[in-house]
């Protein structure tokens, strides 16, 4: 099967109530408690021949700049977390399955989207991806 790469981002959703007992961000991220909807674009053609490690991404909300990040944020190269995951799942006998999507981690930090907001991530030569939180 083909190994594809897509530019994308996640619209965070959190199962915790936002009050004075709200856990720290590191706990939310490590627990997967901020997982939400994955928004991704078409497969990137020729991605193996491009420098994906030093790619920048700019995040906008409703057309307004929010944050900028770099692919080096994902454990210094976006393929390192993918390799770790594949090895760990193989070691435990689970393995990766055809068609599964893997997100390598945030490059711009976590924002909590509000209903009706449209987020756009500009990945430069890898394209733009947009999603509206409903």
Predicted regions: what is each one?
Residues 2-77, 118, 126-134:
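Catalytic-core "active-site belt" of small-molecule-metabolizing enzymes
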Residues 107-111, 125-128:
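Short, charged beta-turn/beta-strand-edge "cap" motif at the junction between a beta-strand
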Residues 90-100, 104:
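Beta-rich strand-turn-strand
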Residues 110-120:
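Short glycine/threonine-rich loop-to-helix capping motif typified by GTGT followed
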Residues 63, 87-92:
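A short beta-strand-loop-beta hairpin characteristic of the jelly-roll/cupin
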Residues 79-83, 103-105:
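Active-site scaffold segments
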Residues 40, 82-89:
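Buried hydrophobic packing segments
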């Amino acid at each position: 099967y083909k190994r594809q790469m897509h530019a994308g981002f996640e619209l965070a959703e959190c199962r915790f109530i936002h009050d004075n007992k709200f856990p720290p961000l590191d706990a939310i991220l490590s627990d997967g408690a901020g997982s939400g909807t994955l928004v991704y674009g078409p497969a990137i053609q020729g991605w193996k021949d491009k420098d994906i490690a030093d790619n920048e991404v700019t995040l906008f909300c409703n057309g307004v700049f929010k944050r900028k990040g770099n692919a080096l944020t994902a454990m210094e190269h976006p393929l390192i977390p993918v390799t770790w995951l594949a090895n760990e799942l193989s070691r435990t006998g689970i393995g990766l399955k055809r068609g599964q999507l893997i997100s390598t981690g945030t490059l711009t930090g976590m924002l909590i989207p509000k209903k009706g907001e449209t987020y756009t991530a500009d990945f430069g030569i890898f394209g733009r991806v947009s999603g509206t939180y409903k």
